[in-house]
Structure formats: C-alpha cells, structure tokens
Design a protein with these regions (language model features):
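Catalytic-core regions built around general acid/base machinery
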Residues: 6-18
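C-terminal cap/substrate-recognition subdomain and adjoining C-terminal extension
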Residues: 17-20, 28-134
Length: 134
C-alpha cells in the first residue's frame, strides 16, 4: 500500500507535538509483522521509536473490527484523547456505536463495500495540511 499524500509528514508532526501514534491494522503478526514494519519504515514513517506503536492482530482469525475496537477501548484507559483515522466503514461504524468518545475520521479510499460510513463523520482524501495549523 502506498501512503496517502501528506501522511508521513502528518504522523511526524503529531509526534513532534508529543502525540502517541498507533498504527492499528487488521494484519496479523505471524504472517505480516516483518513486512508491515519494513513497509512503514521504507516509506518514511517512524517505527520502533518511543511514542510510536505498531499494533497488529495476534492471529489472523480475529475479526478486524472487533480487534480494533478492543485495542481502542484499552487506549482510552491511558490517553485523554483518542482518534481513529480509518478507511473501512465497518470498523468506523462499530467504534462510533461502542466508543462514542473516540474521534473518528473516514479516509475516503478503497474499502470492502460491506457498509457505508455515517454522513456525520469527518472525511479526508489525503493528509496534506500546513503542519503549523495543527
């Protein structure tokens, strides 16, 4: 997967302001950890540094949406604000229903087509912003 325009700079800007960054993916550790970490690293994303976590499913059989919801529920215990930037409506809809205190941003991109996102969610197609503005 190629990163959306501005994504690397956006993540680096968040880190420079002290935010914890979590790459939360439905990929599984046994088959995909090495390749996922290398893919992020090779594209310029911070990986293996303080304040950055790559969180993947321990086994492939876990449902992506439930896994992500449960990880985010745990994140709420240690972080005052949690945001999910996500391209899959199934995941966003579940989190919106079960964890309404999480900020949600729909990344308009290819997805499963199983559900549509709520019209009320913020939507983006890229991360190109003036880094000084956030």
């Amino acid at each position: 997967d190629e990163p959306l325009p501005g994504a690397v700079e956006f993540v680096k800007a968040l880190r420079s302001r002290g935010a914890t960054v979590m790459y939360l993916t439905g990929r599984d550790i046994p088959r995909m950890l090495k390749g996922t970490a290398e893919s992020l690293r090779s594209r310029g994303f911070p990986v293996d540094v303080d304040g950055v976590d790559l969180v993947m499913k321990p086994v492939a059989a876990l449902d992506d949406a439930l896994f992500k919801r449960d990880v985010l529920r745990e994140a709420l215990k240690t972080h005052s604000r949690v945001w999910l930037f996500e391209n899959e409506p199934v995941n966003l809809n579940l989190v919106a229903r079960d964890l309404p205190q999480i900020g949600l941003v729909y990344i308009v991109s290819t997805h499963s087509g199983r559900e549509e996102c709520a019209d009320t969610l913020s939507r983006i197609e890229h991360f190109e912003v003036d880094a000084e503005s956030f």
